């Protein structure tokens, strides 16, 4: 059975035309993107690296990594976001290989072909996140790095990521997230280790509603990112 939640795909398909509108529902992604890319680039210089972006959507992260000199492949199961991503290349002038394929199928096709794998804001949208993590581990070369980001599962995360972000501040459309699909760092760490990935770093991403700014933080109670390395 394919590890795809068609209802999740449909949500992002419906919004695809607004992906590059910085004042749209995707404004948070645009605002956190520089923080994410800088953090990744600090751990492994992206210039000249072969990178695959899992769940690339409209290409916000993929383009940012290509701008840093990476050779980027972006994969997603949403046809509409991929169309938007390809069209935006005409504006940016970047070269990125976008493909409609699952992480698992790509792993079977191209094992150990990438220096870096990114899987950001994606694991909480699939039925079996552990399967995606295994695919990421297969795709990356020995000694290569895999980066994940997702949302913690606890009362604070429910209050901030769903009640706060979707209902009070209306940063995201209602129904964007399902609390049951949120992932604790301990779970992500266990799945990573089972897949042969060693967790090396974890950092939180917090939002200040007064200043309307995001920053990297030691607080991993809500949004967080993880750096892992494939054991040689």
Curated annotation (Swiss-Prot):
<protein>
    <recommendedName>
        <fullName>Ubiquinone biosynthesis O-methyltransferase</fullName>
        <ecNumber>2.1.1.222</ecNumber>
        <ecNumber>2.1.1.64</ecNumber>
    </recommendedName>
</protein>
<comment type="function">
    <text>O-methyltransferase that catalyzes the 2 O-methylation steps in the ubiquinone biosynthetic pathway.</text>
</comment>
<keyword id="KW-0949">S-adenosyl-L-methionine</keyword>
<feature type="binding site">
    <location>
        <position position="76"/>
    </location>
    <ligand>
        <name>S-adenosyl-L-methionine</name>
    </ligand>
</feature>
<keyword id="KW-0808">Transferase</keyword>
<dbReference type="GO" id="GO:0010420">
    <property type="term" value="F:polyprenyldihydroxybenzoate methyltransferase activity"/>
</dbReference>
<dbReference type="GO" id="GO:0102208">
    <property type="term" value="F:2-polyprenyl-6-hydroxyphenol methylase activity"/>
</dbReference>
<dbReference type="InterPro" id="IPR029063">
    <property type="entry name" value="SAM-dependent_MTases_sf"/>
</dbReference>
<keyword id="KW-0489">Methyltransferase</keyword>
<keyword id="KW-0831">Ubiquinone biosynthesis</keyword>
<dbReference type="GO" id="GO:0061542">
    <property type="term" value="F:3-demethylubiquinol 3-O-methyltransferase activity"/>
</dbReference>
<dbReference type="Pfam" id="PF13489">
    <property type="entry name" value="Methyltransf_23"/>
</dbReference>
<dbReference type="InterPro" id="IPR010233">
    <property type="entry name" value="UbiG_MeTrfase"/>
</dbReference>
<feature type="binding site">
    <location>
        <position position="55"/>
    </location>
    <ligand>
        <name>S-adenosyl-L-methionine</name>
    </ligand>
</feature>
<comment type="similarity">
    <text>Belongs to the methyltransferase superfamily. UbiG/COQ3 family.</text>
</comment>
<dbReference type="GO" id="GO:0032259">
    <property type="term" value="P:methylation"/>
</dbReference>
<feature type="binding site">
    <location>
        <position position="120"/>
    </location>
    <ligand>
        <name>S-adenosyl-L-methionine</name>
    </ligand>
</feature>
<feature type="binding site">
    <location>
        <position position="36"/>
    </location>
    <ligand>
        <name>S-adenosyl-L-methionine</name>
    </ligand>
</feature>
<comment type="pathway">
    <text>Cofactor biosynthesis; ubiquinone biosynthesis.</text>
</comment>
């Amino acid at each position: 059975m394919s590890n795809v939640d068609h209802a999740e795909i449909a949500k992002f398909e419906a919004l695809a035309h607004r992906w590059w509108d910085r004042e749209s529902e995707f404004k948070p992604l645009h605002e956190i993107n520089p923080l994410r890319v800088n953090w990744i680039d600090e751990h492994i210089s992206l210039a000249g690296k072969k990178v695959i972006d899992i769940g690339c959507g409209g290409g916000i992260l993929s383009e940012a990594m290509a701008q840093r000199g990476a050779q980027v492949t972006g994969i997603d199961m949403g046809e509409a976001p991929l169309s938007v991503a390809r069209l935006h290349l005409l504006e940016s002038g970047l070269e990125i290989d976008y493909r409609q394929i699952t992480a698992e199928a790509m792993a079977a096709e191209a094992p150990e072909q990438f220096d870096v794998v990114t899987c950001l804001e994606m694991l909480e949208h699939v039925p079996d996140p552990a399967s995606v993590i295994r695919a990421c581990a297969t795709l990356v070369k020995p000694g290569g790095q895999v980066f994940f980001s997702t949302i913690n599962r606890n009362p604070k995360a429910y209050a901030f990521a769903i009640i706060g972000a979707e209902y009070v501040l209306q940063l995201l459309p209602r129904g964007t997230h399902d609390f049951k699909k949120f992932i604790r760092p301990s779970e992500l760490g266990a799945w990573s280790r089972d897949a042969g990935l060693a967790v090396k770093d974890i950092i939180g991403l917090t939002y200040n509603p007064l200043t309307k700014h995001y920053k990297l933080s030691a607080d991993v109670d809500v949004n967080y990112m993880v750096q892992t390395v494939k054991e040689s």
